[in-house]
Design a protein with these regions (language model features):
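Short acidic/polar active-site loop segments enriched in Thr and Asp
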Residues: 129
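A structural signal for short, well-ordered beta-strand segments and their strand-loop junctions
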Residues: 51-53, 132-135
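A structured, charge-rich N-terminal accessory region that forms the first stable segment of a protein
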Residues: 30-43, 51
Length: 255
């Protein structure tokens, strides 16, 4: 009996795919992604035209299959898109958009792929304009921008930061963490850092007000002391005048 093989049925994805990315290797990797994601979301809190994600799968199969052609950048930003929650980034459901900026957080097990295979993918297929990588333990840090279809290394500025033309922000290392900086050189704060800064500002204002109050109290005490001294001098003069009058001496005729 001849067995008839059933034709392979393509696996089409559901409308919203979950990310297939594995857990991050170390707490420092997780912390780095949280810093990048939360600081940028806070800094662009008034914008609705971008999507930023960390450790999320990007599905980009030309056949719209979920089981082929997928990658998971550690951190990426897509510009000129709707800002809303997603479980993954599915290129064919996003008007063919790929990330504008990618940051890979290197580890010993992924560094070779990030420096080579992924770099070529982001350059030749995704055409991602800005690509950075950073090793949270060795502090290896490089960035590339797409020029005429090829990645060109971005030069460091005086602070050893790299400029992202897509983000209009600097990317640089501070306290062994990769951070964003404004064109003016100000650190892009996380929500926690902003709250701490606000608390510090309130505390400084409180201390300033307390210092002003103490200064005002000291000025009031000085004025009271001067008034008391004047009053004591007046009383002494009155007593002396009275004694002179008792002695038959007119104090107004003295002197």
């Amino acid at each position: 009996m001849v067995q008839i093989q059933k034709p392979e049925i393509p696996t089409f994805p559901p409308e919203d795919l979950w990310s297939d990315e594995p857990p991050l290797e170390t707490y420092r990797h997780l912390e780095e992604l949280i810093i990048l994601l939360t600081s940028l979301n806070r800094f662009w809190s008034d914008r609705t035209d971008f999507f930023a994600a960390g450790n999320m799968t990007v599905y980009y199969s030309s056949r719209q299959r979920k089981d082929e052609e997928l990658r998971g950048p550690d951190f990426f930003v897509v510009l000129n898109t709707e800002r809303r929650e997603r479980k993954s980034w599915v290129v064919w459901e996003e008007d063919g958009k790929y990330p504008n900026v990618i940051i890979e957080v290197l580890s010993d097990s992924t560094a070779t792929v990030d420096r080579n295979k992924k770099k070529l993918l982001y350059q030749d297929v995704w055409r991602t304009p800005d690509y950075f990588w950073f090793h949270p333990y060795t502090m290896e840090f490089k960035g590339f921008t797409l020029v005429h279809g090829k990645y060109v290394e971005i030069p460091l500025n005086e602070q050893s930061w790299l400029w992202s033309d897509e983000l209009q922000l600097y990317v640089g290392i501070l306290n062994e963490r990769l951070r964003f900086f404004t064109p003016e050189g100000e650190l892009v704060l996380t929500p926690e850092e902003e709250a701490d800064a606000e608390r510090q500002k309130v505390e400084e204002e409180r201390q300033k007000a307390e210092l002003e109050r103490q200064r005002a109290d000291a000025e009031r005490q000085r004025a009271d002391a001067e008034r008391q001294q004047v009053e004591e001098e007046r009383q002494k003069n009155a007593i002396l005048r009275q004694k002179l009058l008792e002695l038959g001496i007119n104090p107004d005729e003295i002197g």
